[in-house]
Amino acid sequence: MEDEAHEFFHTSDFAVDDLLVDFSNDDDEENDVVADSTTTTTITDSSNFSAADLPSFHGDVQDGTSFSGDLCIPSDDLADELEWLSNIVDESLSPEDVHKLELISGFKSRPDPKSDTGSPENPNSSSPIFTTDVSVPAKARSKRSRAAACNWASRGLLKETFYDSPFTGETILSSQQHLSPPTSPPLLMAPLGKKQAVDGGHRRKKDVSSPESGGAEERRCLHCATDKTPQWRTGPMGPKTLCNACGVRYKSGRLVPEYRPAASPTFVLAKHSNSHRKVMELRRQKEMSRAHHEFIHHHHGTDTAMIFDVSSDGDDYLIHHNVGPDFRQLI
């Protein structure tokens, strides 16, 4: 150190004033350093004082709330106002508008806490907005009882017994109950019983409508004596006494003895016909024949009476009428 100062004094030419000036500068620098240190001490003391005045916060707070230095937490009143405002906005929007907003933004709206209080959702699972499950409306199934599987062999046997039997409905019903197998359900007998009741009603109606004079006789037309007709009609002897063909002609005033249906058992080709024109020709021929027979009979009766008359007029008749050989020329 001393060697360096000695070299400095011998190698450098400097004045005393310069040395003094340099010392003054050093003093200023020292004063600046002292001032800076004083200022630093003052700032440190003030910071320590402000830190001492403020209450110290620890990690565990008595009220159980922890705050972060980077997050600004609003007060409770401000949070209530924000929630109230969001509720008003949600209520003012209709479900259609909410759905449109969801489609535009691509995010679902806030779920209703009342409807989703059951099971918590998994935050990791993401559900798509557009669901592919489309429910198709279907017709509700009826609650009517389904018919059980029927035994066709037993049913055919019962039907053959029903159609081949000439007895009444009650007898058929009892015979079918006897022939029905014990394992068959009662549902199989219900339709047959209904059919038997209907057939029995038709048979009773037919028995009532049959004429009382002949219990075993079948109904026949009183004009053509046929027993096969699709419908019985009213005639001169009362309702349901003529067949369909004869009843139609009777209603129109054209029923004559010469008319007979072709299927009538009393049909004679020389006397009857089912054509109106042919019937009129037969009637005309019949009337002409009857008139001719009446004329011949009347003329023959008159001649016989005049010949065998014993009165005085008999001679005049013989004179004026040339009956027998004329003998006057011989006299």
UniProtKB/Swiss-Prot annotation:
Highest taxon of the lineage: Eukaryota
Keywords linked to the UniProt accession: Activator, Cell wall biogenesis/degradation, Developmental protein, DNA-binding, Metal-binding, Nucleus, Transcription, Transcription regulation, Zinc, Zinc-finger
Motif (Nuclear localization signal): 139-146
Pfam families: GATA (PF00320)
Molecular function via GO: DNA-binding transcription factor activity; transcription cis-regulatory region binding; zinc ion binding
InterPro entries reported for this sequence: GATA_TF (IPR051140), TF_GATA_pln (IPR016679), Znf_GATA (IPR000679), Znf_NHR/GATA (IPR013088)
Tissue specificity remark: Expressed in the vascular cylinder of roots. Expressed in the differentiation zone of the root stele.
GO terms, biological process: cell wall organization; circadian rhythm; positive regulation of DNA-templated transcription; response to light stimulus; tracheary element differentiation
Positions of GATA-type zinc fingers: 215-269
PROSITE patterns: GATA_ZN_FINGER_1, GATA_ZN_FINGER_2
Any single Gene Ontology cellular-component annotation: nucleus
Gene3D superfamilies: Erythroid Transcription Factor GATA-1, subunit A
Comp. bias intervals (Low complexity): 34-47
Compartmental location: Nucleus
Region (Disordered), start-end ranges: 30-49, 105-138, 174-218
SMART domains: ZnF_GATA
Compositionally skewed regions (Polar residues) per UniProt: 116-134
Family: Belongs to the type IV zinc-finger family. Class A subfamily.
Its biological purpose: Transcriptional activator that specifically binds 5'-GATA-3' or 5'-GAT-3' motifs within gene promoters. May be involved in the regulation of some light-responsive genes. Transcription activator involved in xylem formation. Functions upstream of NAC030/VND7, a master switch of xylem vessel differentiation.
Note: Overexpression of GATA12 induces the formation of ectopic xylem vessel-like elements.
Name recorded for this polypeptide: GATA transcription factor 12
Species: Arabidopsis thaliana
